[in-house]
Amino acid sequence: MPMNDTFRWIVVVFLATHIPATIMMDSQALVPAKFVPKFARSLLEFHVNANHDPLMEFQPVWFKSLIAFELVFQLPFFFVGCYAFYHKRNWIRLPGIVYGTHTATTLIPILADILHSGDIPSAAARAQLFFIYLPYLVIPAMIAVVLCANDQPFGAQGNAPAKRAKARRRGFLPVKTA
């Protein structure tokens, strides 16, 4: 069964918005401050103060290791994933499963830390921060589940390369027959 179009668009928007968030916010756990634009440092400071985020404030080593993986592997996937989900390409299935399972798995210790951190001043602040991070568990987990459940998540048309399929629709290439 092909992927629901609403979910496909949720994934495209999720991945597209994750690009600036990763570059401007998350990368600050590893990139020296002198290389980070002032507006991005201010944005992170605002987030830490408004949401009482001890992970971005104190940046423990285990958290930095997850950010390193995000920068090296997930950031490129965001671009590739946006393209593939937007253009309905079935070849994204395996990379999407890997991305979804890895990302969902990394959110377990992050959410556990938020739930048990002594650095968050109140239950309301803890809940607020928990719900800020929760979509980064739920959406990747849903991506993995949906892609695991479908050999061809975008149906048969998801197998054709974009340029060849477009040329074929316009009559420039012959249609293959069995």
Regions found by a protein language model. Give the residues of each.
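N-terminal signal-anchor transmembrane alpha helix
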Residues: 5-36
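Hydrophobic alpha-helical cores of multi-pass transmembrane domains in eukaryotic membrane proteins
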Residues: 12-24, 72-76, 97-109, 131-145
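Interhelical loop segments of eukaryotic multi-pass membrane proteins
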Residues: 30-50, 154-162
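Interfacial helix-start motif at the membrane-water boundary
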Residues: 49-72
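Juxtamembrane helix-break-helix junctions at the cytosolic face
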Residues: 78-93
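Juxtamembrane "helix-exit" motif on the non-cytosolic side of transmembrane helices
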Residues: 110-120
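Non-cytosolic membrane-interface motifs at loop->transmembrane helix junctions
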Residues: 119-132
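Non-transmembrane, juxtamembrane loop and terminal tail segments
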Residues: 156-178
